């Protein structure tokens, strides 16, 4: 059997870039909760003892940006300089302006356009991907790396591993077999975890706890064997972390947010952007389309691309590739996709209920936007596709 290795990584919620994603999306949630028509393009950056929230926001909502930034940092666990940031005493700078009137006129006619008329907030191309290798219809390498990161946070917050600090990274290498275009996982080749920790714990204790409380509950036993390689805090020491260790910026973890290097990416980040920004809403509907194709049995693996022009409602192009796994031709699948999904930005927002705030976007900002079992992730709902199996 001819196999190959493929690797995906993840970072958990205390990573500086992910901290910024979460602050940006918490701001978006707060704006949408009070004003569903909010236009939000919110960026965040952070370094030692500093968080800056900046961008373009037009909203009727009364939002305390500084409070949102501090609350988000605190909820992650940044409660002292020792762990990388002190939420209550760090400096928070806010530089927010309104959306350009030129963009507002071209995209939503200063809120006068009907949903079906609303244009894309910018040009760009977005991808959706799905594969039958996991129940989530997501790549196994990405699913495992992401779940390891989430588990690190869980055992930190519930006290199972009290020596853990908020920052951490994971990486999983999976050995795969290509079965006529479909990806079949054979085994886990390598597991890498680098996690921030306090001064008191030894490397041996770290390795033992990570194996017992993080790896064991996450990675199914069938994928682990005596040859699986474990790199657990391979640099030896990771006490200084969070924004004290590295600067952070919104939108720098776009592969972690999506498919772990599988499929493709148009380059546009998600966090801090309202649904008129097709970087986000376009990628969400493309995932729903790809997932629905695989769930319907039309293909074992699929990628969908859509593209837009600023101010134009209809997509410029829609593309489907099933990597040779389709039960019918890609051309016929594309026809079904176009008949089933409305790719106009205003209609995506309506059909996926994307104008609702709360904490639904904050939830997306750590541990991936796709493959999540959560009612707020409306783009994960499979749409039934009508097709007839060809005669054998």
UniProtKB/Swiss-Prot annotation:
GO BP term (any one): one-carbon metabolic process
UniProt-listed InterPro entries: ADOMET_SYNTHASE_CS, S-AdoMet_synt_C, S-AdoMet_synt_central, S-AdoMet_synt_N, S-AdoMet_synthetase, S-AdoMet_synthetase_sfam
Residues the record lists as binding ATP: 15, 167-169, 235-238, 246, 252-253, 269, 273, 277
Disulfide pairings: none
Free-text function comment from the UniProt entry: Catalyzes the formation of S-adenosylmethionine from methionine and ATP. The reaction comprises two steps that are both catalyzed by the same enzyme: formation of S-adenosylmethionine (AdoMet) and triphosphate, and subsequent hydrolysis of the triphosphate.
Cofactor binding annotation: Binds 2 divalent ions per subunit. The metal ions interact primarily with the substrate. Can utilize magnesium, manganese or cobalt (in vitro). Binds 1 potassium ion per subunit. The potassium ion interacts primarily with the substrate.
Pathway: Amino-acid biosynthesis; S-adenosyl-L-methionine biosynthesis; S-adenosyl-L-methionine from L-methionine: step 1/1
Quaternary structure annotation from Swiss-Prot or TrEMBL: Homotetramer.
Natural source organism: Mesembryanthemum crystallinum
Catalytic activity: L-methionine + ATP + H2O = S-adenosyl-L-methionine + phosphate + diphosphate
Primary localization: cytoplasm
Domain of life from the UniProt record: Eukaryota
Record EC number: 2.5.1.6
First-level EC class: transferase
Residues where K(+) binds: 43
Name used for this protein in its record: S-adenosylmethionine synthase
């Amino acid at each position: 059997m001819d196999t190959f290795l493929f690797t995906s990584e993840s970072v958990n919620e205390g990573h500086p870039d992910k901290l910024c994603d979460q602050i940006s999306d918490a701001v978006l949630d707060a704006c949408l909760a009070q004003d569903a028509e909010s236009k939000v393009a919110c960026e965040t950056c952070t370094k030692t003892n500093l968080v800056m929230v900046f961008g373009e926001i037009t909203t009727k909502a009364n939002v305390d940006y500084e409070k949102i930034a501090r609350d988000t940092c605190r909820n992650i666990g940044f409660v002292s300089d020792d762990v990388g940031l002190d939420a209550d005493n760090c400096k928070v700078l806010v530089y927010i302006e309104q959306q350009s009137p030129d963009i507002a006129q071209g995209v939503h006619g200063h809120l006068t356009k009907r949903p079906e008329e609303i244009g894309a907030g910018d040009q760009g191309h977005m991808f959706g991907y799905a594969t039958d290798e996991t129940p989530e219809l997501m790549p196994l390498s990405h699913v495992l790396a992401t779940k390891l990161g989430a588990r690190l946070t869980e055992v930190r917050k519930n006290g199972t591993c009290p020596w853990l600090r908020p920052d951490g990274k994971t990486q999983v290498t999976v050995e795969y077999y290509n079965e006529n275009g479909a990806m079949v996982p054979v085994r886990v080749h390598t597991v890498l975890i680098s996690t921030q920790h306090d001064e008191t714990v030894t490397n041996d204790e770290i390795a033992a706890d990570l194996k017992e409380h993080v790896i064991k509950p996450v990675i199914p036993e069938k994928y682990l064997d005596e040859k699986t390689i474990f790199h657990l805090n391979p640099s030896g020491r990771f006490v200084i972390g969070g924004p004290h260790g590295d600067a952070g910026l919104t939108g720098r973890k776009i592969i972690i947010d999506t498919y772990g290097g599988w499929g493709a990416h148009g380059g546009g980040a998600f966090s801090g952007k309202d649904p008129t920004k097709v970087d986000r809403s376009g990628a969400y509907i493309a995932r729903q389309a790809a997932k629905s194709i695989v769930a319907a049995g039309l293909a074992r693996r699929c990628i969908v691309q859509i593209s837009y022009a600023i101010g134009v409602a209809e997509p410029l192009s829609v593309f489907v590739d099933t990597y040779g796994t389709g039960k019918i031709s890609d051309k016929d699948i594309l026809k079904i996709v176009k008949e089933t999904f409305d790719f106009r930005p205003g209609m995506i927002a309506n059909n996926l209920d994307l104008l609702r705030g709360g904490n639904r976007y904050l939830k997306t900002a750590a541990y991936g936007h796709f493959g999540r079992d959560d009612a707020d992730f409306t783009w994960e709902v499979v749409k039934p596709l009508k097709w007839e199996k060809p005669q054998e």
